[in-house]
Amino acid sequence: MNSLKNHFLISVPHLKDPFFEKSVVYLCEHDKKGAMGLIINKAIKKNNITLKDSNSDIELNKYLEENYLHIGGPVLTDRVLFLHTNNDISKSVPVSDEVSISGNIELLSSIQKSKDVKSKLFLGHAGWDSGQLEREIENGDWLIQKSSTSIIFEQEIDNIWIITTNSLGIEIGDISNTSGYS
């Protein structure tokens, strides 16, 4: 299977895992070793979080005054990551020509001050071991779509799952609630 980096994984209705039910995952990495992504359409209802580094708390809580904190996934749920536009920011890793990822909280201050940079903050991430994601896709658990920065950064999180399924030309009610092959 070709790399699905910079693609969306869209969960199908039968996927009832609490993290992934009606989720859209942005894949930041996918290779023969496995895959890593961030759920872009679920927020945590929390105003303040505390990290081990107290200086990071200040930057993080300033950011959270104006932005959501998203559930990135069930892996390393005490770790903060963020996606942002503008690949010219140091200490970030490009995912595509338009999107980068970072775990460096100190960057939040400069990102928040820039009117040209859009961002999303996540707690935790989704991860798959070698071959695991491919098996889930073959099993019919995920739909695949090329990513869109407007969906990642501009859409209301409650609408993202429906928008992505509709953009595939799929009526979600037409998808079976059981997995496997037809």
Q: Predicted regions span which residues?
A:
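A short aromatic-anchored loop/beta-hairpin motif
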Residues: 1-122, 126-182
